[in-house]
């Protein structure tokens, strides 16, 4: 009887710790449903129906492992990835890392900020510039929560992630996909032609976000409660739940595009405005509005996460700190310049993804090296199998991004 009480008590304590430590992965998961993912998934679904859903499944599993490694580094060492690079690499290398990480954070933010502005434009009927002003105001308001600590921000961003997931449950209801074909697309790999291979690479290549790798390790480095092993165990639950939700959203995006566009002959849908305008007559005004709202929620939350990540890389690499509102003001400027110059926002989205591809290997390689170092990690060091899987992911993601980069540059030129 006493043993049962002890077991129940320890089980309750473990659940309580899991709940207390839940949140960092929800912030990280937002990076996986940003407007860049909207554009890629919609294009893939419209062009190839359910045939590329399996790519989303595998991309999400890879991303899950990478986020677990990032979170584990923070828990095991009490330092984030940028700080570890600063401590272990020569100063010129550290400065190079900082500059490229800042450029990538700004390129990512450009895509996310413009994505949210497009969302406001679509649902409110305002101009893209007015949408950008609304995006700026909304992100400042969300960032103000940081003054009250990490938890309120985690709750708001987690809420926005759940809102986007709920929006796509509604979209699935409206579009009524063929569940048998959907299931087949998730399980059976298919690449019907070279364009499908390129789009599949786009889905996979755009999934892993370097700025989120830096950020996640900083969100877990100051976690308290329980032993390191217990915190790591709780964090695995956090990552599993948050990334499963993000994975569902990506699957639902592609499945909705397949059901609504591909099977009605609209296979050429390539941008967010086009998707919104085509959804309305095909499904309903409500379906188009829900799409617009989900784009705003994803854009706002991901641009906030991008601002936080930029702060982490600056403090981690060069120990320099500027107020978040100053950083937000500076990183908004490229978006306003792009809009005022009248440049094509979808083209800018694509080009920002190209810039992003440069930083993936630079974040992944040191992450794997540090988490495989027994002196640094102690009992949380990577197992041999995790190391092997990790390096396979690195090689695959880097190869795909190089291929994507070459293909995109040739396509843009």
UniProtKB/Swiss-Prot annotation:
GO terms for molecular function: cadmium ion transmembrane transporter activity; manganese ion transmembrane transporter activity; metal ion binding; symporter activity. Pfam families: Nramp. GO terms for cellular component: plasma membrane. It is a multi-pass membrane protein. Residues 1-19, 72-95, 146-155, 221-238, 298-327, 371-387 are cytoplasmic. GO terms for biological process: iron ion transmembrane transport. Keywords: Cell inner membrane, Cell membrane, Ion transport, Membrane, Symport, Transmembrane, Transmembrane helix, Transport. It comes from the Bacteria. The chain crosses the membrane at residues 20-39, 52-71, 96-118, 126-145, 156-175, 197-220, 239-258, 277-297, 328-344, 351-370, 388-406. It is found in: Cell inner membrane. Residues 40-51, 119-125, 176-196, 259-276, 345-350, 407-413 are periplasmic. H(+)-stimulated, divalent metal cation uptake system. Belongs to the NRAMP family. HAMAP family: NRAMP. This is Divalent metal cation transporter MntH. It comes from Salmonella enteritidis PT4 (strain P125109).
């Amino acid at each position: 009887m006493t043993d049962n009480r002890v077991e129940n008590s320890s089980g309750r304590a473990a659940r309580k710790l899991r709940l207390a430590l839940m949140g960092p992965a929800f912030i990280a998961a937002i990076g996986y449903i940003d407007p860049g993912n909207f554009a890629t998934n919609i294009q893939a679904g419209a062009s190839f129906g359910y045939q590329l859903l399996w790519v989303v499944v595998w991309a999400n599993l890879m991303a899950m492992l990478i986020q677990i490694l990032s979170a584990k580094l923070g828990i095991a060492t009490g330092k984030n990835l940028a700080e570890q690079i600063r401590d272990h690499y020569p100063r010129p290398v550290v400065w190079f890392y900082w500059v490229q990480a800042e450029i990538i954070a700004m390129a990512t933010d450009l895509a996310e900020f413009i994505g949210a502005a497009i969302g406001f434009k679509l649902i409110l009927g305002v101009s893209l510039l007015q949408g950008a002003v609304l995006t700026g105001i909304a992100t400042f308001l969300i960032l103000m929560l940081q003054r009250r600590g990490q938890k309120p921000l985690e709750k708001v961003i987690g809420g926005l992630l759940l809102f986007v997931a709920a929006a796509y449950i509604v979209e699935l209801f409206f579009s009524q996909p063929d569940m048998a074909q959907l299931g087949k697309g998730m399980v059976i790999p298919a690449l019907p032609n070279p364009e499908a291979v390129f789009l599949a690479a786009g889905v996979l290549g755009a999934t892993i976000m370097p700025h989120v790798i830096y950020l996640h390790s900083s969100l877990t480095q100051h976690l308290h409660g329980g032993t390191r092993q217990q915190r790591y165990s709780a964090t695995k639950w956090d990552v599993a739940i948050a990334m499963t939700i993000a994975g569902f959203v990506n699957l639902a995006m592609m499945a909705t595009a397949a059901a609504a566009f591909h099977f009605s002959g609209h296979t050429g849908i390539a941008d967010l405005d086009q998707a919104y305008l085509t959804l309305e007559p095909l499904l309903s005004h409500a379906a188009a509005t829900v799409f617009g709202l989900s784009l705003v929620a994803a854009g706002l939350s991901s641009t906030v996460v991008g601002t936080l990540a930029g702060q982490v890389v600056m403090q981690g690499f060069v120990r320099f700190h500027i107020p978040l509102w100053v950083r937000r003001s500076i990183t908004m400027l490229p978006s306003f310049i792009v809009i005022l110059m009248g440049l094509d926002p979808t083209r800018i989205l694509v080009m920002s993804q190209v810039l992003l591809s440069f930083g993936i290997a630079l974040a992944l390689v040191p992450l794997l090296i540090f988490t495989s170092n027994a002196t640094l990690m102690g009992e949380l060091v990577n197992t041999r199998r995790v190391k092997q899987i990790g390096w396979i992911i690195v090689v695959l993601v880097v190869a795909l991004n190089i291929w994507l980069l070459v293909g995109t540059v040739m396509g843009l030129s």
